[in-house]
């Protein structure tokens, strides 16, 4: 124990000491006054040295006599710079003074001396700055950050020698911790040596910075020469979404959370290598809804929030490996900060004091109900609880949630002494209504000690108890020398009267000295006192043997010493009535143990067993594993685990005791759970309704417990059906309610709302397991607008848009918005006359959780049709007007995009864009995309740090099309990505991004635009991009069809042409928009229906195609059009005929290479849809349709197709993260079709994909992205055309005629920290690319920003003086020397020609290889002499490109072609007109004049 008391607040100054020498019958009290409040006060363990920090002026104080006298720590450079004062948690000699900058100080001798150390970073703004090793105090990590302008990176440093040297561990680590973080970690285990060096770090995802992509890495080499190894948390597989890790006793826990759920998964290890997922007896564990409590060396204690209230929990205790948790007590009292009324009595095993909520049912129904809190105590480690008793009355004590002192609330190492403030009666009253109570038998019996609330502390192993009045100001202290039976008072000297803030003593409570911190009013503000209370001078005698008793720490119901963990516990403590002091300073009382015979309580459930419903038996949690070769038949028997094991660390006596872990005979049938049937299983269900109106999956996410696959359906008869097993069995729900619509939560897959027309509603938070009713403030609106708006991060926050004054009599019917933060428990008015209100996500914006945008009719008058866009961060107590007269707004990942009408009806729409939700900027649209009047935008997608918009060009019915424009990274500057993209009358466009792989998208364009403008029907072609819309190409058709025949058209050299390409039916033709080409879990695979030819043909003539390499190559799998669905992350693909009655389906187990027929119905069915869970990870599929053949049954039918029993999919695939290609998986690298080096977005990524020939299943969602390998050099594919530039037929970018690029100097004004600006080149980097070096097409000619010349030239040093002289001279000298040598040694000399000679074959013969270089160099002499004036000119102009030089060129032409640029190095700053000649690239001169006229680069 180091820090038992932590103070909150200010500092000190002034040091005026008053000393009052008390009589022998009272303590000596010394008072020191300070101007500012002390903070971070702590004792060095086993010493009288105390320190605290003046948080106001940055000084640190130290006392070496337990607080009687104080000195400022005066080390060179430290005064006034202390930002925090931190004791080492396990080393009693060390402490750290941290400054805000990079200089800090450490002491290793209890503040006698200090040593300075520096780190090249500021302290972390989000984490505790130091992370300590549990066993080696010299090993510490420091968490900091370093900023370069607005770009800040988290940095983690480490030391292994107590900060004598400091090393960088990693950048951008979100949280790092030592594996050995506690002194007890690994006790009793033979851990490998490398675990002592092991570090765990939570880092961002490879492709995403969102929390759900976080990874947990470890390294045994401080991440030297490695990126770390991903921790296999779940059965050998890595898990994404790691929030953080925590160490408690001998356990390390890791919490993970998947996207779209609040539910967490907790993983635990006790050896830093093998991890297990924890199970909480069927209870959900949610984010910010659990608290890891003080635990033991043999179990973890965790309090988990109850389902519907954040301030009521359930206490769980784990088995010895932390895997299985059982409920101890329900309805524990918590507060909104996660503190729980729970405390273990210090130094005594098994005694726990908790507070619970008596009226929990009422509290869960309404947040306005006041909790009635009662106290309970357990003497058997939480198995049973009983009330606290003062005589016959129940006692209730204030606990952790409203603690008023630092350190423990009730107890200390003083054996058996427990105190608290509370009251007797039915429940706990206010703190100020409480009295002080004491128990000296560890909580069995209690008595009142003092009237009114007091702070209290124990000293001299309980011989002395000190208390101070805590309901107001006081000038006295109280103390007891007989376990709180009798009390005495002592006055503070010189009339000092204070409001007590902290009463504390040295850790261990073994000294006779106490410290009291208090405040008092001063002439100006407040003043503070530290009061030293010393009982040593009372001159009591030292206790002798007769003054002690052998006290049993725990008693059972018979008042006999009780056993726990196989032993009884006793303490030798001073008798209450003894008139003596123990005086064993810094020597804590040691317990004595007496072993007991083993009982049932000494055993726990063995691995793979859990407690049965009776709470006594242990039943298998999964199928048992029999010895090899034993179980040949289900009826065979084998000897296996009884289900029990002795709790590790338990020392009970086996002989004569209970023996629950004795092996027992088991039946082999227990080793098979759901034995594979070897075939596909079908379950068909019928409904009275004719068809379904809609269905929704409430998908269980990776971090969610359970095995359910929940589907909810609403039928044409308004019936609601629920299935928890993917449609095998259905049950009707909410039968008595008139449900008119179902609203699944947009952001949380566990949640759905069921609404009626009168404002009543129901919701589920657990995927239909339970339902709860709510009442809305108004009926749903009548404007066909969304009724509910959901918060992206806060599950319980809603906005309800209801109808007001809509009584059917004309009236003033309008929509009004209300909000709730507790699932409709309480509603609050937000705004009237609204069209729509939305919560805005804060993740990418750093804004408030309360950021809300609303569209409101101007002047609250719907008739004028003018909508204004308003926002608020305080529920419209204050509001901000962004735009008037808007058309609509949309939110998409990073961007908020607004369509604004012009002032006149003839004006085109404008676009406003914001990233932070506060500041909007007008978007710069490409001039070659004209937006006609009253025509719309469609916001397509923005997951790749750029917004895609479809801008309507032709809005005539059945002739609609438009252009896709793409933004830069802040959404303000748009360029044309693709023209003539098809859309329909509802505004939907034929555009779809591939799921699971960034940057790949497909779109259907109108191929006959000129004809369409004249009234002809549209003809479509399919285009694909592999670099996020920078370049589009037609799709390459297969070489042969599914029957092995060639197509009627042919490609050109394997490349698609206008006359021969693959075209697929797209978004606008789908009956269900959820039926996408691709799946997020089947990486690289897409399926579509279409044809090969010049245009897309009718859908009735379509065939079905597949790609396995993200659209580079395609294969026809079947003639005709099919509906498709992916299962088990693509290891199962199912096809069913579309629009054709059938009783069979097709399935593939090898990514579509081969197909098998399966008959799922005896009667032909018309299948309307095929579905599975949205992640496509299930082995179950659901067909929706009707029977139409002979013997048909009426009504809607669903057919569940279950592949989990199929032999080929009955065994789970093996993935070894260290050897990802060793077993059932291989690493697949996506490629760009136009890049030979395999790079995509500037890097090579590798994805886990199951080997098609392996007979196994993937299981729950696989973390597909394995690694990002080499970072590639930049190429043309990493760039797109800049604003006012457009792509040419050869792929280059040329400026649109008559238009100018954006002012490049704006970067200097928009970013005050910018150092330079670059001349426009026509290119800009794709926001998604990670490339480095190579072609810098966007950064060629640089100029300094105003007043940034000095920083600019540090970044770009100039060549001048002697350096410039030698650059010119050295090539001339080398060429001249070589020429002279060749002239004097070559036998031919210049001008000598000999006909008919065969040559001497000498070293310097003309044919000698060695002559070729000197000849070139001689030729170079002439070239250099000729080029010298040009070289000097070029160098001069290069220098003048940086600064103004008299006579320097004021302008230069850009590179004239991509090829001429490629011939030069990217580190040239300027190039003169004749430099191509100098560098030998005159072969491009023919192109330059024309290219320059076109503005082509």
UniProtKB/Swiss-Prot annotation:
Name one matching Pfam family: Sortilin-Vps10
Q: Which PANTHER family match?
A: SORTILIN RELATED, SORTILIN-RELATED RECEPTOR
Entry similarity comment: Belongs to the VPS10-related sortilin family.
Membrane topology, as annotated, equals: Multi-pass membrane protein
**Disulphide bridges:** none
Q: Which residues lie on this side of the membrane: Cytoplasmic?
A: 1383-1408
Q: Does the keyword Transmembrane apply?
A: yes
Q: Where is this region: Disordered?
A: 1474-1497
| Taxonomic superkingdom | Eukaryota
Where found, per UniProt?
Golgi apparatus, trans-Golgi network membrane; Prevacuolar compartment membrane
- Its source organism is Ajellomyces capsulatus (strain G186AR / H82 / ATCC MYA-2454 / RMSCC 2432) (Darling's disease fungus)
Q: Which InterPro entries does the UniProt entry name for this protein? A: Sortilin_C, Sortilin_N, VPS10, VPS10-sortilin, WD40/YVTN_repeat-like_dom_sf
The BNR repeats lie at 61-71, 377-386, 437-447, 479-489, 721-731, 1105-1115, 1147-1156
- One GO CC term of this entry? membrane
Cleaved signal peptide residues: 1-21
Q: Where is the composition biased (Acidic residues)?
A: 1474-1491
Q: Which residues are glycosylated?
A: 321, 970
- Any one Gene Ontology biological process term? Golgi to vacuole transport
Is Protein transport a UniProt keyword of this protein?
Answer: yes
**Any ranges marked Lumenal in the topology annotation, and which?**
22-1361, 1430-1497
Transmembrane intervals? 1362-1382, 1409-1429
Under which name does UniProt file this protein? Vacuolar protein sorting/targeting protein 10
């Amino acid at each position: 124990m180091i820090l038992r008391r932590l103070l909150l607040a200010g500092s000190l100054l002034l040091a005026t000491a008053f000393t009052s020498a008390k009589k022998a019958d009272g303590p000596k009290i010394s008072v020191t006054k300070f101007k500012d409040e002390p903070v971070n006060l702590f004792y060095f363990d086993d010493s009288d040295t105390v320190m605290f920090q003046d948080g106001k002026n940055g000084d640190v104080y130290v006392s070496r006599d337990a607080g009687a006298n104080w000195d400022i720590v005066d080390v060179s450079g430290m005064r006034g710079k202390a930002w925090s004062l931190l004791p080492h948690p396990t080393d009693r000699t060390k402490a750290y003074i941290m400054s805000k900058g990079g200089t800090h100080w450490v002491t290793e001798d209890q503040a006698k001396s200090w040593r300075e150390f520096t780190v090249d970073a500021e302290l972390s703004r989000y984490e505790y700055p130091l992370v300590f090793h549990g066993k080696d105090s010299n090993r510490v990590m420091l968490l900091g950050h370093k900023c370069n302008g607005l770009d800040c990176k988290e940095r983690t440093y480490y030391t292994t020698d107590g900060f004598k040297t400091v090393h960088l561990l990693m950048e951008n680590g979100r949280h790092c911790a030592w594996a050995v973080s506690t002194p007890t970690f690994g006790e009793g285990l033979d851990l490998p040596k490398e675990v002592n060096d092991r570090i765990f770090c939570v880092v961002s995802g490879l492709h995403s910075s969102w929390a759900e992509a976080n990874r947990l890495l470890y390294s045994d080499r401080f991440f030297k020469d490695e990126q770390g190894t991903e921790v296999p948390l779940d059965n050998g597989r890595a898990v994404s979404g790691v929030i953080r890790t925590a160490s408690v006793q001998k356990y390390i826990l890791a919490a993970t959370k998947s996207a779209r759920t609040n539910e967490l998964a907790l993983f635990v290890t006790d050896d830093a290598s093998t991890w297990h997922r924890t199970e909480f007896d069927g209870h959900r564990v949610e984010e910010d809804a659990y608290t890891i409590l003080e635990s033991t060396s043999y179990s973890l204690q965790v309090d988990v929030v109850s389902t519907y209230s954040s301030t009521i929990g359930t206490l769980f205790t784990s088995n010895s490996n932390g895997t299985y948790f059982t409920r101890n007590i329900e309805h524990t009292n918590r507060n909104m900060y996660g503190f729980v009324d729970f405390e273990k009595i210090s130094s005594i095993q098994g005694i726990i004091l908790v507070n619970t909520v008596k009226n929990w049912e009422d509290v869960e129904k309404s947040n306005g109900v006041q909790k009635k809190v009662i106290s309970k105590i357990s003497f058997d480690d939480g198995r049973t609880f009983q009330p606290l008793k003062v005589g016959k009355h129940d006692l209730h004590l204030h606990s952790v949630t409203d603690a008023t002192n630092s350190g423990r609330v009730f107890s200390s190492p003083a054996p058996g002494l427990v105190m608290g403030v509370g009251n007797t009666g039915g429940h706990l009253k206010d703190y100020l209504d409480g009295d002080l109570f004491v128990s000296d038998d560890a909580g069995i019996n209690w008595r009142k000690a003092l009237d009114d609330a007091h702070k209290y502390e124990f000293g001299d192993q309980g011989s002395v108890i000190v208390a101070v009045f805590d309901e107001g100001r006081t000038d006295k202290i109280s103390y007891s020398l007989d376990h709180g039976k009798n009390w005495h008072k002592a006055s503070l000297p010189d009339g000092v009267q204070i409001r007590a803030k902290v009463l504390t003593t040295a850790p261990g409570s073994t000294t006779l000295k106490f410290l009291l911190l208090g405040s008092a009013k001063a002439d100006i503000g407040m003043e503070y006192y530290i009061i030293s209370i010393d009982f040593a001078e009372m001159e009591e005698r030292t206790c002798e043997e007769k003054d002690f008793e052998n006290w049993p720490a725990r008693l059972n119901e018979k008042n006999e010493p009780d056993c726990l963990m196989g032993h009884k516990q006793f303490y030798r403590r001073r008798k209450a009535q003894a008139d003596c002091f123990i005086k064993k300073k810094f020597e804590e009382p040691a317990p004595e143990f007496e072993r007991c015979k083993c009982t049932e309580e000494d055993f726990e459930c063995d691995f793979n067993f859990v407690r049965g419903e009776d709470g006594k038996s242990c039943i298998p949690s999964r199928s048992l594993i029999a010895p090899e070769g034993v179980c040949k038949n289900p009826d065979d028997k084998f000897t296996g685990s009884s289900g029990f094991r002795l709790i590790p660390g338990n020392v009970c006596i086996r002989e004569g005791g209970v023996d629950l872990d004795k092996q027992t005979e088991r039946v082999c049938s227990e080793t098979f759970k759901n034995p594979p049937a070897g075939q596909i299983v079908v379950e068909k269900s019928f409904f009275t309704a004719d068809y379904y109106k809609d269905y929704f999956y409430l998908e269980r996410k990776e971090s969610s417990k359970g095995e359910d696959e929940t589907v909810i359906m609403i039928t044409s008869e308004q019936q609601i059906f629920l299935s928890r097993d993917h449609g095998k069995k259905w049950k009707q729900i909410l039968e008595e309610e008139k449900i008119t619509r179902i609203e699944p939560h947009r952001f949380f897959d566990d949640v759905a709302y069921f609404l009626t027309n009168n404002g009543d509603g129901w919701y589920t938070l657990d995927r239909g397991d339970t339902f709860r009713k709510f009442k809305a403030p108004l009926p749903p609106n009548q404007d066909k607008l969304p009724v509910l708006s959901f918060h992206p991060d806060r599950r319980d926050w809603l906005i309800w848009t209801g109808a007001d004054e809509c009584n059917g009599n004309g009236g003033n019917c309008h929509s009004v918005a209300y909000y709730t933060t507790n699932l409709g428990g309480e509603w609050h008015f937000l705004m009237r006359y609204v069209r729509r209100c939305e919560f805005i996500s804060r993740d990418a914006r750093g804004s408030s959780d309360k950021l809300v945008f609303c569209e409101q009719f101007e002047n609250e008058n719907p008739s004028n049709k003018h909508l204004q866009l308003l926002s608020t961060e305080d529920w419209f107590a204050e509001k901000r007007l962004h735009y008037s007269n808007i058309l609509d707004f949309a939110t998409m990942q990073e961007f908020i995009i607004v369509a604004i009408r012009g002032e006149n009806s003839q004006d085109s729409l404008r676009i406003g864009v914001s990233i932070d939700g506060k500041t909007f900027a007008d978007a710069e649209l490409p001039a070659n995309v004209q937006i006609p009047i009253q025509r719309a935008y469609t916001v397509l997608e923005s997951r790749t740090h750029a917004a895609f918009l479809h801008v309507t060009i032709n809005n005539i019915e059945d002739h609609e099309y438009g252009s896709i424009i793409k933004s830069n990274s802040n959404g303000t500057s748009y360029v044309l990505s693709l023209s003539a993209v098809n859309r329909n009358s509802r505004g939907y466009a034929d555009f779809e991004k591939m799921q699971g792989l960034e940057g790949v998208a497909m779109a259907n364009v109108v191929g006959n635009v000129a004809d369409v403008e004249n009234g002809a029907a549209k003809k479509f072609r399919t285009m694909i991009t592999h670099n996020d819309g920078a370049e589009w190409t037609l799709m390459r058709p297969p070489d042969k069809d599914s029957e092995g025949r060639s197509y009627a058209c042919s490609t050109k050299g394997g490349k698609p042409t206008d006359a021969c390409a693959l075209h697929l039916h797209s978004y606008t033709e789908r009956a269900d928009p959820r039926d996408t080409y691709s799946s997020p879990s089947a990486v690289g695979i897409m399926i579509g229906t279409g044809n090969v030819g010049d245009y897309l043909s009718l859908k009735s003539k379509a065939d079905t195609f597949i790609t396995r390499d993200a659209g580079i190559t395609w294969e026809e799998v079947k003639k005709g059009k099919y509906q498709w669905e992916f299962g088990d992350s693509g290891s199962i693909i199912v096809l069913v005929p579309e629009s054709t009655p059938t009783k069979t389906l097709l399935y593939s187990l090898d990514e579509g290479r081969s197909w098998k027929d399966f008959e799922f119905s005896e009667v032909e069915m018309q299948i309307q849809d095929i579905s599975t869970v949205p992640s496509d990870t299930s082995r179950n599929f659901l067909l929706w349709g009707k029977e139409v053949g002979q013997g048909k049954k009426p009504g809607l039918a669903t057919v569940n197709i279950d592949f989990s029993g199929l032999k080929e999919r009955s065994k789970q695939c093996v993935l070894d993260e260290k050897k990802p290609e060793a077993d059932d998986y291989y690493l697949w690298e996506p490629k760009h079709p136009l890049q030979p080096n395999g790079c995509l977005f500037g890097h090579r990524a590798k994805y886990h994909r199951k080997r098609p020939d392996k007979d196994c299943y993937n299981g729950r969602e696989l973390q597909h992205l394995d690694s990002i390998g080499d970072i590639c050099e930049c190429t043309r594919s990493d760039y797109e055309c800049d604003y006012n530039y457009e792509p040419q037929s050869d792929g280059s970018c040329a400026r649109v005629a008559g238009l100018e690029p954006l002012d490049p100097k704006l970067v200097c004004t928009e970013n005050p920290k910018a150092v330079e600006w670059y001349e426009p080149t026509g290119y800009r980097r794709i926001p998604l690319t990670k490339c480095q070096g190579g072609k810098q097409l966007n950064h060629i000619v640089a100029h300094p920003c105003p007043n940034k010349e000095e920083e600019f030239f540090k970044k770009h040093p100039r060549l001048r003086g002697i350096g410039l002289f030698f650059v010119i001279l050295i090539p001339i000298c080398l060429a001249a020397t070589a020429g002279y040598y060749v002239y004097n040694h070559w036998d031919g000399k210049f001008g000598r020609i000999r006909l008919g000679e065969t040559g001497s074959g000498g070293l310097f013969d003309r044919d000698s290889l060695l002559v070729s270089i000197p000849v070139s160099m001689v030729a170079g002499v002439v070239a250099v002499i000729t080029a010298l004036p040009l070289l000097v000119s070029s160098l001069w102009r290069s220098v003048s490109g940086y600064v103004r030089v008299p006579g320097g060129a004021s302008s230069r032409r850009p590179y004239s072609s991509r090829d001429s640029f490629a011939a030069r190095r990217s580190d040239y700053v300027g190039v003169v007109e004749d430099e191509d000649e100098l560098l030998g690239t005159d072969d491009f001169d023919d192109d330059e004049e024309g290219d320059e006229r076109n503005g082509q680069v």
